[in-house]
Amino acid sequence: MHSLTRIKVLQRRCTVFHSQCESILLRYQDEDRGLQAEEEAILEQIAGLKLLLDTLRAENRQLSREEIYTLLRKQSIVRRQIKDLELQIIQIQEKRSELEKKREEFQKKSKYWLRKEGNYQRWIIRQKRFYIQREIQQEEAESEEII
């Protein structure tokens, strides 16, 4: 039974490692949801700024030089804000890509530990069957000696 005890220890260790990987995967999933929500919020901001930019056009109006400069300045500010938000989206997408790579890595580790745990479980079952068969054979041998 000594080897059976060792196998059970190894199986428990695999279970712990597997559950750690699963908790990390859940944390990554939550982080990805947060980044996705942030990206969607920024996209909404960009859409709003583009609408604002459309309203800042000098369509068939007589404008003084100051009004033209003011309008151009406002358009420039809005365009700059749009570019900044687009840059933030790129950064978020890069973070999500890195997160996806980490998630895939931990998924592989999780599957590895789950597979090892299953192997140890099957080994435990085989060992128990072996011990039971050996006990039955010993009992049969003892009963034959008695007869």
Swiss-Prot record:
Keywords: Virulence. The keyword Transferase does not apply. InterPro entries: Salm_SPAgM. Transmembrane segments: none annotated. The keyword rRNA-binding does not apply. Coiled coil: none annotated. It comes from the Bacteria. Belongs to the SpaM family. Involved in a secretory pathway responsible for the surface presentation of determinants needed for the entry of Salmonella species into mammalian cells. This is Surface presentation of antigens protein SpaM. It comes from Salmonella typhimurium (strain LT2 / SGSC1412 / ATCC 700720).
